[in-house]
Amino acid sequence: METVKTTSGKTPGEADASPLKPGDSYVQSFARGLEVIRSFSARAPEQTLSEVAAATGLTRAGARRILLTLQTLGYVRSDGKYYALTPRILDLGFAYLSSTPLWNLAEPAMEALVDEVKESCSAAVLEGLDVVYVLRVHTHKIMSTNLGVGSRLPAFWTSMGRVLLAALPPEELRALMARREQRAFTRHTLTGDDELYAEIARVREQGWALLNQELEEGLISVAAPIRNARGQTVAALNISGQANRTSEQMMRERLLPQLLAATRHISQLLSASGRMHL
């Protein structure tokens, strides 16, 4: 099953805050508004005023002002007790996708890959300690899933995350390693620093990552990088399946070659577009 657990063990308001310190150009009220939006999630789709204030660290009065502003703008609704995001919030996320024309080119390649391998395919980028899904093509098999565009998962324990982490400069990787969550998601989870460094080094050398039930029992996936014209890794693509019908050997022998062909094709499209980033 592909059930999202947590992102990085933090509340949405805490997750992967920018290490940059606010300066004169920092608009605190705007930042607080974003924190309020991020406090809503699959685990907290509806919240009271007190819950929003607790999740964001704001006072009740401050949280109320922001919620009422968002409600006036149409991004939040309320029944008088509970607040929830409205579909209009999708405009903010789709602005990113619509401003990134590569995904209009990548999606057909991903759909073709799904047709070939009969497994789901996703693309993600790295944001702090998380991978953020920016495109997902589902297989037609009947299965439970709540992963979609905008979903976040802990980078150290996803195949796409390890591909993206493997491309980081050593100092950035060390900084993220020091901040990562210290727990095992399953009995298969790699938790030690030495284990994770060794695995990420192996991913860097071989150019792809395979994870077998480290984040969730029953979930197996393989991922490879999408690179720009300079050879820089800017995103990752994966194929995910269920371990009870997809073995590591099948992933390596049958699915990996097709995944690598797809990432090469998408990388070529990115290079041809002249864009350096997604």
Give residue spans per PLM region.
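Short, solvent-exposed recognition segments
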Residues: 2-16, 142-215
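N-terminal helix-turn-helix
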Residues: 2-104, 108-111, 264-272
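Amphipathic alpha-helical effector-binding/dimerization core
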Residues: 84-180
